[in-house]
């Protein structure tokens, strides 16, 4: 890493750490920002880098949320009784119970969806292009419906999460730190991953899967790993989000296909898919626009969002980063040979 | 669940009720599905906003009925208005995403879906609305089986439209142009077909069909700005299962899906109806994929 | 592979810049406990989303009461007169958003007095937040019984809990059965409920009562939220012929049930459902809605009164006059107005803006409003106001149970719709 880029990384980290202290009233919103960053990054691994556009990554988010909830509650109480509509039991988690539950919950919330991703890969990854997209959307909807019908986890009534011990202010900061940590870890991991041959392989799958197979690439293995990586981080995000929100239920909180599920895609496209920083930029821009429209354009926020998606998709395909790359290629280390009497060598694209 | 199956065994007349309900529901799905299949087959655009076009048609019908026009009569002006709307959307949005990759078109129509839902919500409010057809119902088997006349009419209309579409595509010049473009756009262009007009026409016809479906739905059930997704999902399931070019298959699949939903609702419980639809989608996709894989393997 | 790391220096700058922009827009927190002469109450409520109709009913109720109280001189605390005002946010009918927005209302806007959201799900998400920050909330639109088993000290609910909505129907059925010489435990129940916290609580109330009288439940379906077709469920009811049919699925559920019951020729001697008024059953379906029993938190014929609105009938007249888009007053609106009255009363008794004093004042509430009697249990729910059953007779809602409040006798059994 160059010195300049290291400084910038540290600056961002510092801004991230300072934010909840500078604007304490917005801590929870900022935590959601980090979740968005994580959403965009994990989506890009599948969609941007590998060319498998998933509309159902939100499944892992919801799975993580529910697994964590069940673990947190189940360690101390009977889950079925806890979620029952009647005869609600008096609930009181000690600090130790809460933290162990949370830690174990987050851990399992990462592992569980990863395993599910591996299984789903085996089933769905034979589908190509739009069929894969529709198939994953179907999985997400099915997950929501089935969870709604399962009364052990509360069904449509949802689950009230255990309350965070510790005074007001502490809770927000704790989860903010956790979300930021998750997003940063995801970034570091993906950054490393994209510097290995793994990324070459998945890019090859994106560019031409049949040829890649013909060249001897075990595409199935790579596809499964890519999806599992996404699932791992999404599960963690789900667990944290569920605890932060305090009350979870299947259709809108855990498996919000039409909101978060699509936001993932929109953010990445906005920023420029297939790059490391594109999703992050996209997430930032998207998040900012969303918060602004929610506050100042109440009633019109979704229209603004819909229009943004349309404009982005129709007129601004390559996203912010792609657009910048085209305009100022030298910023990205791409050398465009403009000497008139030579055949223009476009340089390698990142 | 077994109790419910027993009912069907002990009193077979209820099978008829389920069949009739299912087929009338399926007929409406069929309408929505062939519009989708038409657009998908010709332009490769997968219109995620299909259900929202349907809702819009329903609301236009509602608005016209508030001015005293009977819903059945309103179908014609609604179809015309939706046709025009479809043309407009094609020009503004669809035209630019046709050449792009398939996922992009999915996302563009998704953005359109969100926008349309919200505009409908702002204009008409979030209440569910329903239209009175003023028709009665047929009672059969001593009142054991009831079917409203409007459902029978809807079924008839779907058949008529299906036949009309098939004839249009087979016999008319424009129909041939559409089929040519679907097969190979470049070749069609070389042969002088104005593919741009073909695409616009296809999309607008779809929009009109959705409009008609919307008015029917408002008469049989309810419309609400956010209910479009239920129809979009089912249309996708039907088209994916039946394949793109095969209109008779689309109808058969749609009717089948309608009946299957009724049975799953009866036997398993209404909460599993949506899950059944989605589960079916996944099954079909996976089955398709295994077939393709076997095909690929056999080629090797 | 190396290039894109270098070049993204600009990218990073963009990210930092955007983050700072968000911060700048966020601005500094405003302390809005009482600005000058205005007491600001806060509410995250369903302005959009699937409960937007009910959210509108509730917020119209809130606003109507605020306007009336302000017209009457506002609230006097220690000799100073304050007007009331409400700051709204849209929670899009989503619990997660409700919780987030309440954090914002309390932390950023500094508001210390909360009016509840619409719906049990959003209220369930809101209660832990207000509890954590020790901010009192008066809610009148979240009826789930499970809200009152957690020992919340800062939440006060003016309405009757959800399990009481349709339970009186079963009581009534038992009474009517015995009067006509039938054995109550021979009665069969067919029911369908939407799969959401409120409706499932209503269901539990019915299940508990059915168990008490030993009645058998023969159809028990859940309606998924996005479907507007229950014909499969109704076909089952046609086959099994229950004596009592109950539905709860918010406005959409009532509309769908009434229409499809007529279409499929389904009937029972007792038919009951929630949300009849918001579904506008009498205007939409006319004769097909006759005989349906509708629980309500409030009816304009009840004999409650207070100093702000007068009698229930006075409130009814005034609300309809001020809101021409309503043909009847939905109880969500009446509840909303009641909640604001409770706050005003608490301010008056506490003579303070301090949240702890107000919490204690709220806990000690013992008043009659046009909406009903208000007295809170230790858990926060209103134990002084029963649910009332009305029946649609001749296109009007008529109170039929509990018998001591009845204006007319109940029509039983319900006649089939032609």
Question: Where do the protein language model's features map onto the residues?
Answer:
Chain A
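Transmembrane alpha-helices and adjacent helix-loop boundaries
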Residues: 1-350
């Amino acid at each position: 890493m160059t010195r300049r880029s290291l400084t910038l990384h540290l600056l961002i980290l510092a801004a991230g750490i300072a934010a909840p202290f500078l604007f304490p009233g917005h801590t929870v919103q900022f935590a959601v920002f980090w979740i968005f960053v994580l959403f965009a990054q994990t989506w890009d691994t599948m969609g941007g880098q590998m060319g498998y556009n998933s509309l159902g990554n939100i499944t892992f988010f919801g799975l993580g949320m529910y697994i964590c909830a069940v673990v947190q509650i189940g360690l101390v109480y009977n889950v079925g009784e806890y979620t029952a509509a009647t005869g609600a039991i008096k609930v009181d988690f000690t600090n130790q119970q809460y933290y162990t539950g949370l830690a174990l919950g987050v851990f399992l919330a990462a592992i569980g969806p990863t395993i599910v991703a591996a299984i789903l890969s085996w089933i769905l990854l034979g589908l190509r292009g739009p069929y894969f997209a529709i198939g994953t959307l179907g999985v997400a909807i099915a997950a929501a419906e089935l969870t709604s019908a399962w009364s052990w986890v509360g069904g449509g009534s949802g689950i009230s999460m255990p309350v965070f011990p510790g005074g007001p202010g502490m809770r927000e900061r704790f989860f903010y730190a956790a979300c930021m940590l998750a997003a940063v870890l995801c970034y570091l991991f993906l950054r490393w991953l994209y510097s290995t041959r793994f990324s070459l392989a998945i890019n090859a799958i994106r560019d031409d899967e049949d040829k890649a197979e013909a060249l001897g690439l075990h595409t199935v293995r790579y596809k499964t790993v890519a999806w599992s990586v996404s699932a791992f981080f999404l599960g963690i995000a789900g667990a944290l989000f569920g605890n932060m929100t305090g009350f979870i239920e299947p259709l809108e909180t855990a498996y919000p296909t039409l909101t978060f599920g699509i936001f993932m895609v929109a953010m990445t496209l906005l920023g420029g898919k297939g790059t490391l920083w594109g999703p992050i930029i996209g997430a930032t821009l998207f998040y900012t626009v969303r918060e602004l429209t929610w506050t100042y354009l109440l009633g019109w926020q979704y229209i603004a969002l819909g229009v943004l998606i349309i404009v982005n998709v129709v007129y601004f395909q390559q996203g912010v980063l792609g657009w910048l790359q085209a305009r100022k290629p030298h910023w990205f280390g791409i050398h465009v040979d403009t000497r008139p009497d030579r055949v223009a060598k476009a340089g390698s694209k990142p | 669940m077994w109790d419910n199956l027993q009912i069907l065994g002990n009193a077979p007349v209820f099978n008829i009720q389920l069949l009739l309900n299912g087929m009338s529901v399926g007929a409406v799905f069929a309408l929505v599905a062939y519009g989708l299949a038409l657009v998908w087959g010709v332009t490769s655009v997968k219109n995620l906003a299909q259900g929202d076009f349907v809702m819009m048609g329903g609301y236009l019908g509602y608005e016209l009925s508030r001015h005293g026009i009977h819903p059945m009569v309103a179908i014609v002006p609604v179809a015309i208005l939706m046709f025009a709307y479809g043309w407009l959307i094609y020009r503004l949005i669809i035209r630019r995403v046709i050449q792009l990759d398939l996922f992009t078109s999915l996302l563009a129509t998704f953005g359109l879906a969100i926008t349309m839902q919200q505009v409908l919500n702002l204009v008409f409010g979030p209440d569910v609305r329903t239209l009175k057809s003023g028709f009665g119902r047929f009672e059969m088997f001593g009142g054991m089986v009831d079917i409203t006349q409007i459902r029978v009419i809807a079924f008839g209309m779907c058949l008529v439209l299906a036949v009309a579409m098939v004839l249009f595509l087979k016999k008319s010049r424009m129909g041939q142009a559409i089929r040519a473009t679907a097969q190979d756009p470049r070749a069609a262009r070389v042969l002088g077909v104005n593919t741009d007009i073909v695409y616009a026409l296809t999309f607008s016809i779809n929009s009109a069909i959705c409009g008609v479906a919307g008015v029917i739905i408002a008469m049989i059930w309810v419309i609400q700005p956010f209910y479009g997704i239920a129809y979009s999902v089912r249309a996708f399931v039907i088209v994916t299962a039946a394949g793109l070019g095969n209109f008779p298959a689309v109808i058969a699949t749609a009717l089948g899906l309608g009946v299957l939903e009724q049975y799953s609702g009866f036997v398993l419980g209404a909460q599993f109806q949506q899950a059944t639809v989605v589960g079916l989608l996944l099954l079909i996709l996976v089955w398709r994929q295994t077939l393709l894989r076997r095909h690929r393997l056999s080629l090797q | 592979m190396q290039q894109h790391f270098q070049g993204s220096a600009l990218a990073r700058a963009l990210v930092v810049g955007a983050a700072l922009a968000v911060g700048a827009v966020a601005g500094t927190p405003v302390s809005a406990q009482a600005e000058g002469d205005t007491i600001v109450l806060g509410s995250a409520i369903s302005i959009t989303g699937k409960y937007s109709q009910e959210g509108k009913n509730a917020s119209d109720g809130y606003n109507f009461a605020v306007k009336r109280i302000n017209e009457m001189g506002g609230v006097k605390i220690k000799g100073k007169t304050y007007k009331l005002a409400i700051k709204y946010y849209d929670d899009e009918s989503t619990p997660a958003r409700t919780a987030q927005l309440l954090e914002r209302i309390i932390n950023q806007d500094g508001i210390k007095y909360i009016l509840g959201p619409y719906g049990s799900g959003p209220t369930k998400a809101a209660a832990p937040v207000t509890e954590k920050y020790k901010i009192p909330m008066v809610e009148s639109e979240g009826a789930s019984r499970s809200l009152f088993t957690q020992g919340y000290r800062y939440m006060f609910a003016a309405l009757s809990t959800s399990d009481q909505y349709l339970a009186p129907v079963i009581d009534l059925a038992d009474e009517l059965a015995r009067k006509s010489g039938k054995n109550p435990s021979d009665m069969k129940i067919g029911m369908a409920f939407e799969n959401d916290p409120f409706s499932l609580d209503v269901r539990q109330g019915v299940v508990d009562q059915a168990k008490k009288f030993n009645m058998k439940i023969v159809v028990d379906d859940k309606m998924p939220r996005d479907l507007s077709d229950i014909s499969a469920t109704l076909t089952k009811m046609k086959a099994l012929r229950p004596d009592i049919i109950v539905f709860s699925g918010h406005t959409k559920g009532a509309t769908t049930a009434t229409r499809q019951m007529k279409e499929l020729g389904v009937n029972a001697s007792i038919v009951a459902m929630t949300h009849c008024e918001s579904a506008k059953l009498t205007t939409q379906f006319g004769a097909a809605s006759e005989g349906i029993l509708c629980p309500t938190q409030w009816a304009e014929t009840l004999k409650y009164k207070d100093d702000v609105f007068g009698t229930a009938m006075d409130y009814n007249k005034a609300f309809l006059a001020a809101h021409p888009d309503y043909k009847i007053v939905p109880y969500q609106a009446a509840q909303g107005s009641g909640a604001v009255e409770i706050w005003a009363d608490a301010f008056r008794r506490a003579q303070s803006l301090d949240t702890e004093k107000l919490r204690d004042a709220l806990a000690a509430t013992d008043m009659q409003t046009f909406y009903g009697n208000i007295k809170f249990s230790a858990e926060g729910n209103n134990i002084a106001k029963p649910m009332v059953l009305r029946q649609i007779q001749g296109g009007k809602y008529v109170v039929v149970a509990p018998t001591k409040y009845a204006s007319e006798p109940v029509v039983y059994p319900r006649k089939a719709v032609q």
